[in-house]
């Protein structure tokens, strides 16, 4: 089924432009409320958001939709995405909602949905929601006496802070560590510095002054330069860069170098395997993860289970294969012993635990393998299907033959933007760059002809 509303991570788009309009947000509330309105009990939904300006608008629109469908709404305010997943379970809600466009700029926003178990919704349920969104839902509205109520929940962020702190081993404190943290002017601007301070660290926060339009603006995990500068400036032991909704993390070592999600997964997998905590004999990661990670794990008799791009697919693979570590190169790290979705703060705490226990620097701890040269370029498209063109297919086949067993090629449409992503990796950087440039040129020519 071709998706009209949902991408790889919920519904996303520019605020006040379809599909991210208050009208559709209200209809999503009605549709989702209708699907999860099962049984005679009073149904409830929790709604969290990040700090972008349009969050107020979409939050109120969704409240209207859910209450019209007869559900009670608990409003959490700004809180990390993993906090919404946790509180959906804790508050015995039927559905959880996070209003966020993650690492995107403030102009964008999105709607992420969680089931009562705290996991993101399956493709099947999303398809049911899509079907309802295109129907007249008047008959689905609650009777006047059954309309829902809405209330703001106080203290919810402190419950999440306690949950995050409990993931640090009890024999470890952060005393003696100077930690610079960039909260991207986003959802974790209160919780992350507080959690680190309560665990004993000296905390140097940046990106903690949201104003509605500065979320992810030259800060956070997609713009690590600000944190790199701060790490040098204050001589921090480590830098932690979160994104707008704090479900992803990158680390900056004491030398100012960026440590990506692949290296972080290697650290956690190694540490947990040594402690007998790693389940399933491996980890799950997407097709974007570096070949170097796969080779590193193979050398330790651990398996890398590759999935489609999107942390929800990583989680599905983890549940299917009994794994408890998974993630993405971009910094989504899922640790199912502690939660149901990516959690930047919790992942960072696991790295800090290894640093404290081994007494080594972050650069010594986190540089586990030499990444295979990887080149990623995007081709913007506005119409047509360039990947179905015969010339493009032949160019892809030729590229795969050139890489053979010494590399990988991945070409896919973005699930959140009008882009085709072209990625290749291999031991010969020159060859990889040439292959990517040739494919970008071929796809671009087909795009231009279609336009």
From Swiss-Prot:
Keywords: Isomerase, Magnesium, Metal-binding, Phosphoprotein. It comes from the Bacteria. Activated by phosphorylation. Binds 1 Mg(2+) ion per subunit. Mg(2+) binds at residues 102, 243, 245, 247. Its cofactor is Mg(2+). SUPFAM superfamilies: Phosphoglucomutase, C-terminal domain, Phosphoglucomutase, first 3 domains. InterPro entries: A-D-PHexomutase_a/b/a-I, A-D-PHexomutase_a/b/a-I/II/III, A-D-PHexomutase_a/b/a-II, A-D-PHexomutase_a/b/a-III, A-D-PHexomutase_C, A-D-PHexomutase_C_sf, Alpha-D-phosphohexomutase_SF, GlmM_bact. The active site is at residue 102. Transmembrane segments: none annotated. One of its GO terms (molecular function) is phosphomannomutase activity. Pfam families: PGM_PMM_I, PGM_PMM_II, PGM_PMM_III, PGM_PMM_IV. One of its GO terms (cellular component) is cytosol. One of its GO terms (biological process) is peptidoglycan biosynthetic process. Catalyzes the conversion of glucosamine-6-phosphate to glucosamine-1-phosphate. Belongs to the phosphohexose mutase family. This is Phosphoglucosamine mutase. It comes from Sinorhizobium medicae (strain WSM419).
């Amino acid at each position: 089924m071709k998706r009209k509303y949902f991408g790889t991570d919920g519904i996303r788009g520019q605020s006040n432009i379809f599909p991210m309009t208050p009208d559709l947000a209200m209809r999503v509330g009605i549709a989702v409320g209708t699907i999860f309105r099962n049984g005679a009990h009073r149904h409830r939904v929790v709604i969290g958001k990040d700090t972008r300006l349009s969050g107020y608008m979409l939050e109120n629109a969704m409240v209207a939709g859910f209450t019209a469908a007869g559900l009670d709404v608990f409003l959490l305010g700004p809180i990390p995405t993993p906090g919404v997943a946790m509180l959906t379970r804790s508050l015995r809600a039927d559905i959880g909602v996070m209003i966020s466009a993650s690492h995107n700029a403030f102009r964008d926003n999105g709607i992420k949905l969680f089931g009562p178990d705290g996991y993101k919704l399956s493709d099947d349920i999303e398809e049911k929601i899509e079907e309802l969104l295109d129907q007249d839902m008047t008959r689905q509205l609650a009777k006047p006496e059954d309309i829902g109520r809405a209330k703001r929940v106080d203290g919810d962020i402190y419950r999440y802070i306690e949950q995050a702190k409990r993931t640090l081993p009890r024999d470890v404190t952060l005393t003696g560590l100077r930690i610079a943290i960039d909260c991207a002017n986003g959802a974790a601007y209160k919780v992350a510095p507080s959690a680190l301070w309560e665990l004993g660290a000296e905390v140097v926060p940046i990106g903690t002054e949201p104003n509605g339009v500065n979320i992810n603006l030259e800060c956070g995990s997609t713009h690590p330069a600000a944190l790199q500068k701060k790490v040098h400036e204050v001589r921090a032991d480590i830098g932690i860069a979160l994104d707008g909704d704090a479900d992803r993390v990158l680390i900056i070592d004491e030398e100012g170098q960026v440590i990506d999600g692949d290296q972080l997964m290697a650290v956690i997998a190694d540490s947990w395997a040594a402690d007998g905590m790693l389940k399933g004999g491996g980890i799950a990661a997407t097709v974007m993860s570096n070949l170097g990670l796969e080779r590193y794990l193979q050398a330790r008799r651990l398996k890398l289970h590759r999935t489609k791009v999107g942390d929800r697919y990583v989680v599905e693979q983890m549940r299917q294969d009994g794994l408890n570590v998974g993630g993405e190169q971009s910094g989504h790290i899922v640790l199912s012993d502690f939660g149901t979705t990516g959690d930047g703060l919790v992942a960072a705490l696991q790295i800090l635990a290894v640093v404290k226990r081994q007494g080594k620097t972050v650069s010594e701890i986190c540089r586990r393998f030499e990444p295979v040269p990887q080149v990623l370029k995007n081709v913007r498209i506005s119409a047509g299907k360039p990947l179905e063109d015969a010339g493009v297919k032949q160019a892809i086949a030729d590229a795969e033959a050139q890489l053979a067993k010494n590399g990988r090629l991945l070409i896919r449409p973005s699930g959140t933007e009008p882009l085709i992503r072209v990625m290749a990796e291999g031991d010969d950087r020159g060859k990889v760059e040439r292959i990517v440039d040739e494919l970008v040129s071929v796809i671009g020519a087909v795009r231009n002809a279609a336009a």
